[in-house]
UniProtKB/Swiss-Prot annotation:
Family the UniProt entry places it in: Belongs to the UPF0251 family.
PANTHER family: PTHR37478, UPF0251 PROTEIN TK0562
UniProt source species: Thermoanaerobacter sp. (strain X514)
InterPro entries in the cross-refs: RNA_pol_sigma_r3/r4-like (IPR013324), UPF0251 (IPR002852), WH-like_DNA-bd_sf (IPR036388)
Name of the protein in question: UPF0251 protein Teth514_1147
Amino acid sequence: MPRPPKCRWVRSEPNVTHFKPVGVPMSMLDEVILTVEELEAIRLKDLEGLEQEECADMMKVSRPTFFRIINSARQKVADALVNGKAIRVEGGNYRVYEEEQRGHRGMRHRHGH
């Protein structure tokens, strides 16, 4: 029996969860599902420019696990861009770091689809 996946840590819930080619109705598009942790991996590595080891540490996963997450995310984004598909961000197995009103670090736990 495989062991259950560990939660990955992300900075925040995404503000935008749908992306699509302009001028094409959603009903006409195939869709790629990007998990919240895959989006976080893209943010850390490709937007922030961190090294994979730093990214893995921030998400509380091993380097090989981070490598699998980022590769999956990049493949999905490339598929959507090249083939004109919509991207929906949802689901995954992650925890969110949050600043609470009292000023200490808190977290929310989410399990996706």
